[in-house]
Amino acid sequence: MALLDYTRRAMLAAGTATAIALSAISVTAQTPDDVLVVGQIAEPKALDPAAVTAVNDFRILMNLYDGLVRYKDGTLEVEPALATSWNISNDGTEYTFSLRQGVKFHDGSDFNADAVKFNFDRMLDEAHPYHNTGPFPLSFFFSAIVSVDVLDPMTVKFTLNAPYAPFLSNLAYPTGLIVSPDAVAKHGTDFGRNPSGTGAFKFGEWRSNEAVVVEANSSHWEGAPKLQAVVFRPITDANTRTAEMLAGGIDMMVEVPPVALSKFQGDGYTVHEQAGPHVWFLILNAKEGPFSDVRVRQAANYAINKEAIVNDVLEGTAAVAAGPTPPAFAWAYNNSLEPYPYNPEKARQLISEAGADGAELTFFVTEGGSGMLDPVAMGTAIQADLQAVGLKVNIETYEWNTFLGEVNPGLEGKADMAEMAWMTNDPD
């Protein structure tokens, strides 16, 4: 899987997550009717779309920025946004975009072909004067780009090193959102705290550990949004988030714990569910420790009762994954694949063969993030299953952004395994 480097391996724990969000029909939060208060699972890492990887951040960024293209609502089909049309060369290596006229960034600067070139050069060219405003962890989405050329003020051409089918889809992903070059030049490495895009909402304020506020952009090219503002509140504890929703402190919450859904069955709430291209998995440190032996990695997959996690922890809001491609990609999904069966006896046998009886494992678990609906409960269930076959598992729990700081660079020297989730727009 693209998320992993070669020193780690992934074991699928549960897949095909159902995204769950909850909204109150009768708004009781102490805010005006045209202000929406959203309960998020964590503080955003940054508000620079090229520098972040988490859905928690993307949820804010999609309001602040536009891309050249975007996904049609509820689909992975691409439609125009800041680009009104495009042509693809016969050999599939050149994409020429005609840009939307008259669009301005929130800071008043012009959106044009130079701005588009700036955005992709900043990510991909190490010699670019603002490449140091990264790192850009998902820049590999655009690694096929050889050059970005300005043909005229409102026409830009991308040249690829080979035909690349997901290119348009990747442009629609949040990593492809277009930022203001002037704002990057002004704020440098602090741009992520001072964002400027072309989106339907503009940045209002960021009160650390309290709220990010975005305000209506009355000059948006699609017209002013109906809401005057959206307030994103980081509420890391799921029980607290649920209590805030019940008390009217927030109007909408995301990543609703499955065990809490029964509290919101009344007429005052609407539950929104949608199956998506989301896979939850375990990262295993295959470079050192017990998981450097393939038999122990296999044993872990046999030991974990994934059906029980789906049914008892996640209340049926997920399905057991058979591989890294979720069924949401119907055209790319192999229905003949079978997941590892639950077989603790086989797990014990493999652990014994590997001489790993009683091995101690450090397991990083996040309090919430990346669409995982109940990661602590999932982690506890995984811990119990592994301990039942002779492995000693010590859980270390982290707030989401702290967790990313520990896990994304790799687990070597720190842990043996970690929970993680991945949502993608492309099955490859």
Where are these regions (language model features)?
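Gly/Pro-rich hinge or "lid" segments in bacterial periplasmic/extracellular proteins
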Residues: K72-D73, Y164-P225, A229, N239, ...
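Periplasmic-binding protein-like
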Residues: L168-L171, P257, K263-F264, K287, ...
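Ligand-site clamp/hinge motif
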Residues: T189, N217-K263, T380, K392
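Aromatic- and charge-enriched surface segment that lines or borders ligand/interaction sites
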Residues: T84-P129, K157, P290-S292
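N-terminal lobe/hinge region of extracytoplasmic solute-binding protein
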Residues: G39-N90, D121, H128, S196
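Ligand/substrate-recognition segments at binding pockets and active sites
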Residues: S208, A330, S352-N425
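Surface-exposed binding/hinge segments that line
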Residues: S98, K117, P135-D182
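Structural transition elements
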Residues: V320-E353, G369-A377
